[in-house]
């Protein structure tokens, strides 16, 4: 199953026909510019560089920079990972004493420019990202269709805030399934899927296929290529211990969390799709809903309150003024649950999946997931678009952190 087939289960909010087309035919078709939080420029212990990369994964670029500069890659901070098949601009921090060495680094398709001194940049230290995207091979009436779709979605309050396919895997769409298996305590099933899932189009898929069919760990260690280092780590650990749980827990914590977060994201997407399907409004709070506060167009997901009969009109006015947004569940042991109709829908999904919120507490301690809330709608800021001859539709907009340009484009393109 590829991501298009996987995403076909999630309802579009727009009912109008899309423009079709393709993205990321060239890296320059997808430009991402990070907007950092201002506080990263406070302090003197770290040198802040603007990193421009083309066709590089963020982590791979960071490791290569560290290697060339002679520092540990863990000493380099960044606010978030950016698309690989794109041209991206983001800020990184390095120890101040390493500034000159980093300035001397020369890597193909990577540019580094010293900006100022500041503090260590942690994941999440950004406001959001600005995008410039070209969609090629679109329909002849793409501009008019885009205009109609954007108008329709503005009337409905915004774009559905689905987690993008990047959360689940573009070709091996299994991250969320692995997450569910981990929550069920099936570490062997999770490990076998992590090691063996394949679609036949990626390097190393023949080795994955052989393991999927035979379960032969010794053979897998011989056949798995070196770049599949996490898979090889897991295999070596299983060979040493004979225990799949201990083998899986040998993986770095951020890798294990990817799977739990992917499953959370799947359940959120499912909730959002069901709400659209059942005709429950996304931009009008219902009694029992949990809303998140919004300031300057940025949602603050840690500031929530419940909608009651008493405050319903007050909250509706807040939503109309874009000072609050209706939220959906990121299931976890400490998540604030909705009540009323929204709460029933949350309960229905948990029951279908055989889960309770406490299930997320029973994970090994570092992986236990408290959960939270996420706004149901996405409102691109400064959205502009136009048709460029011999290229296609060009889109420009800003999105808050944690949201996906591909989810905006999905409503316009209707390609999956």
From Swiss-Prot:
Gene Ontology molecular-function annotations: pseudouridine synthase activity; RNA binding; tRNA pseudouridine(13) synthase activity
Domain annotation TRUD: ranges: 158-379
UniProt GO BP: pseudouridine synthesis; tRNA pseudouridine synthesis
Coiled coil: none
Keywords associated with the record: Isomerase, tRNA processing
Residues at the active site: 83 (nucleophile)
Cysteines paired by S-S bonds: none
Catalyzed chemical reaction(s): uridine(13) in tRNA = pseudouridine(13) in tRNA
Enzyme class, broadest EC rank: isomerase
Domain of life, per lineage: Archaea
Entry's EC annotation: 5.4.99.27
Primary role: Could be responsible for synthesis of pseudouridine from uracil-13 in transfer RNAs.
HAMAP family cross-referenced by the UniProt entry: TruD
Family membership: Belongs to the pseudouridine synthase TruD family.
Protein name (record): Probable tRNA pseudouridine synthase D
Species the sequence originates in: Thermococcus kodakarensis (strain ATCC BAA-918 / JCM 12380 / KOD1)
């Amino acid at each position: 199953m590829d991501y298009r087939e996987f995403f076909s289960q999630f309802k579009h909010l727009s009912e109008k026909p899309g423009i079709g087309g393709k993205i990321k035919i060239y890296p320059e078709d997808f430009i991402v510019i990070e907007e950092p939080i201002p506080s990263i420029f406070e302090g003197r212990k770290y040198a802040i560089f603007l990193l421009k990369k083309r066709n590089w994964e963020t982590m791979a670029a960071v490791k290569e920079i560290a290697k060339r500069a002679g520092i540990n890659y863990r000493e380099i901070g960044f606010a978030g990972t950016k698309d690989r098949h794109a041209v991206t601009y983001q800020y990184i921090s390095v120890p101040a004493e390493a500034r000159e060495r980093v300035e001397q680094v020369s890597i193909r398709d990577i540019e580094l420019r010293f900006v100022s001194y500041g503090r260590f940049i942690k994941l999440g230290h950004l406001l959001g990202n600005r995008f410039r995207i070209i969609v090629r091979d679109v329909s002849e009436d793409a501009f008019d269709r885009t205009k109609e779709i954007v108008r329709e979605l503005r009337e409905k309050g915004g774009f559905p805030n689905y987690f993008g396919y990047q959360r689940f895997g573009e070709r091996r769409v299994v991250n969320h399934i692995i997450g569910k298996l981990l929550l069920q305590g099936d570490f062997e099933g999770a490990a076998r899927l992590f090691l063996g899932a394949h679609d036949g189009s990626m390097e190393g898929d023949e080795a994955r296929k052989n393991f999927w069919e035979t379960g032969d760990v010794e053979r897998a260690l011989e056949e798995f290529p070196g770049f599949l280092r996490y898979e090889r780590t897991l295999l070596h650990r299983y060979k040493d211990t004979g225990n799949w749980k201990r083998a899986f827990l040998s993986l770095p914590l951020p890798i294990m969390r990817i799977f739990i977060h992917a499953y959370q994201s799947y359940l959120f997407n499912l909730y959002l799709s069901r709400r659209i399907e059942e005709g429950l409004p996304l931009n009008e709070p219902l009694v029992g809903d949990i809303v998140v506060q919004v300031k300057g167009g940025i949602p603050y997901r840690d500031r929530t309150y419940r909608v009651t009969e008493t405050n319903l009109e007050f909250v509706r006015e807040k939503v109309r003024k874009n000072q609050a947004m209706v939220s959906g569940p990121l299931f976890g042991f400490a998540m604030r649950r909705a009540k009323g109709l929204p709460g029933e829908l949350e309960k229905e999904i948990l029951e279908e999946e055989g889960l309770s919120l406490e299930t997320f507490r029973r994970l090994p301690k570092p992986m236990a997931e408290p959960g939270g809330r996420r706004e149901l709608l996405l409102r691109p800021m400064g959205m502009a678009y136009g048709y460029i001859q011999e290229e296609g539709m060009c889109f420009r907009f800003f999105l808050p952190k944690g949201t996906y340009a591909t989810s905006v484009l999905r409503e316009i393109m209707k390609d999956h």
